[in-house]
Amino acid sequence: RNILKAGIAAKITTLGFDKKGNVAEEHRPQLMQGGALWNGQFYTEGFYYQWMSLYNRIQQKGINEVYEEAAYTWFNRLCAIRILQKNNLYSPVLQYADAARTPIIVDEARQGHLPQMKEDLRQRIVELLDDDTKVTEQFAVLLVAWCHANPILQRCFGTMEDYTELLLPANILAENGFIDLLNHTEFITDEEFRSPELIGWLY
């Protein structure tokens, strides 16, 4: 979880916030007709509202609390997905499809197999899939959609706060990053993944 928290802290910095949670006026997105302008690039309206939700949450709770909340949210969901796939309840979307550490969920999307998702996310992933170098960005959109569409995760953890979707770490797929460690951990055996205690943790 500390690995996730460090990645989330770095991601918040890239979104314009300093270590105290302050943000300069020039780093705030500007809502425009049909989208938002941020750092010289055009984004969807959804990004604007997620960014503002993050800003408001930091003002209300403080940046350290937001680090904790986002790390807790992603840790729980990613570990739960691993448990579900180890018990053959869902396809192994987090596992790698190749030596380049491309997750299966991304590989399947490149073949036209997308999880259920809202239309704005669908448009976003279609654009991203045109660029094979944007694996992490593709993974982030697909993972968010997968979490929203999965009834078990929804029942166990509820709906994610919208700002949390922005905070999946940029190094999530790096060598020795969280997904890499989750896929290759020796701390939990295959037998333990099927234990009632670990499955019970979901509930």
Where are these regions (language model features)?
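Preference for the N-terminal adenyl/adenosyl cofactor-binding alpha/beta module
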Residues: 1-203
